[in-house]
Amino acid sequence: MTDAVQNETVQEASAQEENKLIAERRAKLDQIRKSCKANGHPNDFRRDSLAGDLQKEFGEKSKEELEALNHVVAIAGRVMAKRGPFLVIQETSGRIQAYADKDVQKVLKDKYQGLDIGDIIGVKGALHKSGKGDLYVNMEEYELLTKALRPLPEKFHGLTDQEMRYRQRYVDLIVNEDSRNAFVVRSKVMSAIRNFMISKQFMEVETPMMHVIPGGASARPFVTHHNALDMPMYLRIAPELYLKRLVVGGFDRVFEINRNFRNEGLSPRHNPEFTMMEFYMAYADYKDLMDLTEELLSSVALEVLGSTSMPYGEHTVEFGGTYTRMSMFEAIKHYNPDHAQIQALTEEDIQNRDLMVSIAKSVHVEVEPFWTCGQLLEEIFGETAEPKLMQPTFITGYPADISPLARRSDDNPFFTDRFEFFIGGREVANGFSELNDAEDQDARFKAQVEAKESGDDEAMFYDADYITALEHGLPPTAGQGIGIDRLVMLLTNTHTIRDVILFPAMRPQA
């Protein structure tokens, strides 16, 4: 018998066993409906305690102290295990045991045909401690709140199918503590970022999720149709142009934490729907943003994890201190010491397209005919340097032709005052001094339109209203976007974006 046939046989046997258990549980529910109130789904039990809080408050007390206290609590949660007379009950803060003596067990059997793993129960009783030192609640009052009709996957050797973890996240969260913890960390990261920004006098705002003209980033948008207006609209790829309109309007410091949508591929680093924090700061430049980013990330790591050092794969990354800063050109040279063409390259050579195509092909980049010199430089960097940036690093010196919204460098107008922030071998943030020259922005938008007509699907659209806004005057401003999903990946030591998005995009099941 081949492995494939054997696996199929095991799966069929597991499915048959599961169907049998589901049928048994449905039969139990039918009996419960006949004998219990609310058609077997009561909604009048109220808990007054959480397992985690009880552990903190009473975990150090002795068995005798707890007996003297006779502290009565009401808890509720999902039955995760049955160990003799003990039930293990799980809820949002953790787990606690409940003790059912013989009389209680008899009532449970008579009234509910016995409890199953996965059932949700409410329990009232005094708090005690076992001989092993574990807290438990003596079951004096109890009520089955929800009958689980499907068994949890431990019955079938755990939730081992990675894809099923994402499709049935609700089951993953029940049985996988690491998964639950990752999303607790995510929530804390969001709160820490929001509190930090507010402490720096930034105002949180909300801008449109549907755009008439998609803009603010180089990406393919999702297209929809507004029936009442009879016009196409686009799910936003970035909030940038609306946020900068607010700076024009006089809000000098604004930020937004929300979803962006990009109609692109799925990968360990990419999901079509993702969360970004974008902020804009008048009377500042990109160097100020790098300083602020160092402060923000070290603050978030310390608040959420209690340390600025954390493991990531085989590495230990350090969010504290001053981060490395180098230009894209310098990084390419630094990480390609044995590549003769790259070592001989000068900044002036970057504008030699034939030379850049030759170098790109030599490092296995598949070159598109419409790519500019800046795009070629970025692809060479992405292929040879980016994966090696494990520690926090700001990469500067982005060419203007790949930075259509960034201010040109005063030292060399081929480049812009822009950086991207890398850690763990991936980009996490992008920031720059904003282009506030309306005429230059007009010219760059037109160049983007030409690129789109030449086959670049990710080139930007021309936004006439944004040009009008700039003509009213945008003060010197710097802005940045931080990918929340990728940041959480780092802080939770996970290596695929699906592990930090509750319900990631999935291909249809066969």
Swiss-Prot record:
Organism lineage: Bacteria, Pseudomonadati, Pseudomonadota, Gammaproteobacteria, Vibrionales
Alphabetical GO biological process terms: lysyl-tRNA aminoacylation
CC cofactor note: Binds 3 Mg(2+) ions per subunit.
Subunit: Homodimer.
Positions with a binding annotation for Mg(2+) 1: E420, E427
Binding-site list for Mg(2+) 2: E427
Catalysed transformations (reactions): tRNA(Lys) + L-lysine + ATP = L-lysyl-tRNA(Lys) + AMP + diphosphate
Gene that encodes it: lysS
Predominant location category: cytoplasm
Entry-linked InterPro entries: Aa-tRNA-synt_II (IPR004364), aa-tRNA-synth_II (IPR006195), aa-tRNA-synth_II/BPL/LPL (IPR045864), Lys-tRNA-ligase_II (IPR002313), Lys-tRNA-ligase_II_N (IPR044136), Lys-tRNA-synth_II_C (IPR018149), NA-bd_OB-fold (IPR012340), NA-bd_OB_tRNA (IPR004365)
Protein name per UniProt: Lysine--tRNA ligase
The protein's required cofactors: Mg(2+)
Compartments where located: Cytoplasm
Statement: the UniProt record of this protein carries the keyword Ligase: yes
Gene Ontology cellular-component annotations: cytosol
